[in-house]
């Protein structure tokens, strides 16, 4: 009886520990999405502010550096989502809602980067459009991996909605990549 009691005590402690770890991981994923939201907004604002002509190399490199930071954040967030495992219903809904909220900003940034291509091409450094193309490709890869991890861990009833968001966002990169290719 004493051994059985110890077993249940150990099992209870392990269960509580696991629940706390999963809770922390979900909190980390939510924090990652908040950081991604801030970085996407910063990137979109920098692209919007870049003029069609007469822009500066410093402003163009700021856009590049912001994109590079976003790629790093997306890669870290992908690792966090993967290590968290399947999300519960409430957390899955919260995460999906957060991603849906930044979708218009992502789409706006990708539309504007195409519109601003003449401004980047007019700068005295010839390789800038190629640098932007590389950033776009890397952003698409990182975004796709993050979205794939989210879909894989979404509750079953949210998978289709998550896939729709994933498809919309990753497909939005194609016209931008084509414009700079």
Region locations from a protein language model:
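Mature, structured extracellular domains of secreted fungal proteins
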Residues: 20-181
């Amino acid at each position: 009886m004493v051994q059985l009691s110890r077993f249940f005590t150990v099992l209870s402690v392990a269960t509580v520990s696991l629940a706390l770890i999963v809770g922390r991981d979900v909190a980390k994923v939510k924090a990652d999405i908040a950081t991604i939201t801030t970085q996407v907004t910063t990137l979109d604002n920098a692209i919007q502010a870049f003029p069609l002509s007469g822009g500066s190399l410093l402003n163009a490199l700021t856009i590049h550096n912001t994109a590079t930071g976003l790629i790093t954040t997306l890669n870290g967030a992908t690792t966090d989502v993967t290590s968290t495992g399947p999300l519960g219903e409430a957390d899955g809904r919260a995460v999906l809602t957060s991603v849906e909220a930044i979708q218009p900003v992502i789409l706006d940034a990708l539309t504007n980067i195409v519109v601003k291509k003449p401004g980047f091409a007019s700068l005295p450094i010839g390789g800038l459009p190629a640098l932007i193309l590389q950033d776009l490709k890397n952003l698409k890869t990182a975004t796709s991996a993050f979205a794939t991890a989210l879909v894989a861990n979404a509750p079953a009833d949210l998978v289709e909605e998550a896939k729709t968001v994933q498809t919309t966002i990753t497909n939005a990169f194609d016209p931008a990549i084509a414009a700079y290719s």
